[in-house]
Amino acid sequence: IIMGKMAVAAASITLMVADVVDHTNYIAKSRASIEALKSANLLKSVTINALILGEHGVGKETLARHIIAAPVVDASSFNELLALIETNSSLIVKNFHKITNYKKLKIALDSHKTRIIATSSLPIGESLTDEFFSLKITIPPLRERMEDVFPLMEKFAFEAHMMFDGGMGDEVSLKEIVPDLSKNCYSLRRSVYNAYLMSSFGEEEILSMMERFLAERIGGRNDYRDLLYLFDVPMIRSGYAKFGSQLSISKKFG
C-alpha cells in the first residue's frame, strides 16, 4: 500500500513536471526563461557560437545542453580544451572567463572549425564577446524569475522521489518549503532535498543527528545552559504553529 501511494505521488509529480519541462529539463515559465529558450531553439538550427551568461546555478549548462549534444569541458583545463577542439566538431565550454590564452583558443577554433557554446558566471569584455560569439544569452537569477521557482521545486521533488526510490517524503507539501534562492538552483534543490530527508526522520535519526551536532560544540563550563535553546526554540515555534497563542501553549505544555 505504501509503495502504491508513493507510485501515485511520483506519477502526480511527473505530470506536474511534464507541464513545464521539455526533454532537456530546462524550466521556462518566466518571461526571461522563455526568451532564453527561444534563443536556444534558434541556435539548434544554425552553427554559430554562443555565450550564455548568468550567476552560478541559473541553468546555463542545462540550456547549453539543450542547444547541442557535445562534450562539456571547463575552461580552466585549457590543455584539455585544446585537445578536445582537435577531436570534436562542437563543445560546451564552462567558465569561459577562465580562459588563459584567448589568442591560442581562437587559432585552434578557426583551424579545426569547432563550434562552441560557452557559459560564464562573470561578464566577458565586449571585444572578446564580439571576437568569439555571434549571440549572447543572459539568464537572470532566480530571485528575478519567481515564476520558475515552483516548477523547479516540482522538478527537484521528482528527483528526490527517484533518488530515494520512493521511500520517503510522500507527506511533503512543496508549498510549505521555504525556498532558498541564495545560490539559485543549487540552494533551491537543497531546500527540497532537505525537506524530503527531514520528513523521513524518526526519533532515532533525530537523536543521532543531535548527538553528532553537540559532540562538536561541547567542552565549556556552561554547555547545558548555552545549548538548551536547541530544545526550547523548536518547542516554542512548533507550539505557536500548532496552537496559535502563548496561552494555548501554556495549557498544552503544562
Where are these regions (language model features)?
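Walker A/P-loop
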Residues: T47-A75, E80
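Short acidic, S/G/P-rich loop/turn micro-motifs used as interaction or catalytic elements
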Residues: H56-G59, F78-N79, F96-N101, P123-G125, ...
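Interdomain "pre-motor" coupling segment immediately N-terminal to P-loop NTPase/helicase cores
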Residues: I1-A18
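Conserved RecA-like P-loop NTPase ATPase core
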Residues: A36, I52, V58, A64-I67, ...
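Nucleotide-binding/hydrolysis machinery
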Residues: D19-R31, K38, V46-I48, E55, ...
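Loop/turn-to-beta-strand initiation segments
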Residues: T87-S90, S111-I117
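Bacterial C-terminal helix-turn-helix
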Residues: I1, H56, K60, R217-G254
